């Protein structure tokens, strides 16, 4: 399944979750798009709830189904809870951590920064958004890219960097000090439903 490239706001309303991270999509119209307005939502079956939760998380991180499932399977081989490990692996993606650093206003924009070669890991350029960052690795912006307007604008409006990243705004550099804990990850996701979906 290809990565979704359509209107993010419409998809956010359909899934009932802010994919931009701003929450603006749901402020005026907190219901799915369509001619029937707020009265069109139907009660979902158990399978429907599981599928919806899977789609929420997949689109939140901007992944194809193949990438998403592969990461899910990798999480199942780790000790501990399958669902929590899955969330932690998703959070360790390079494009996501660029977003968490505040270098981009959305994960989609962060993925473009990585794709276009603006991001480095431990001093080496990495242009693979799905690259899994390991604890104690350093993420930075290439010196030639320090003056990018999109990065400057994103930094200006960002007011939160998670505790598992130590960020130096002057150097545009962060160290991924440790893996995230489940309590630090999106509370609106019920990963147990995703485990159930793939276990069917």
UniProtKB/Swiss-Prot annotation:
The keyword Cell wall biogenesis/degradation does not apply. GO terms for biological process: ribosomal small subunit biogenesis; translation. Gene3D superfamilies: Ribosomal Protein S4 Delta 41, Chain A, domain 1, RNA-binding S4 domain. GO terms for molecular function: rRNA binding; structural constituent of ribosome. The keyword Ribosomal protein applies. Residues 22-42 are annotated as: Disordered. Transmembrane segments: none annotated. One of its GO terms (cellular component) is small ribosomal subunit. Keywords: Ribonucleoprotein, Ribosomal protein, RNA-binding, rRNA-binding. Residues 92-152 form the S4 RNA-binding domain. InterPro entries: Ribosomal_uS4 (IPR022801), Ribosomal_uS4_bac-type (IPR005709), Ribosomal_uS4_CS (IPR018079), Ribosomal_uS4_N (IPR001912), S4_RNA-bd (IPR002942), S4_RNA-bd_sf (IPR036986). It holds the Pfam family S4. HAMAP family: Ribosomal_uS4_B. NCBIfam families: PRK05327.1, rpsD_bact. Belongs to the universal ribosomal protein uS4 family. Part of the 30S ribosomal subunit. Contacts protein S5. The interaction surface between S4 and S5 is involved in control of translational fidelity. One of the primary rRNA binding proteins, it binds directly to 16S rRNA where it nucleates assembly of the body of the 30S subunit. With S5 and S12 plays an important role in translational accuracy. This is Small ribosomal subunit protein uS4. It comes from Bacillus cereus (strain G9842). The gene is rpsD.
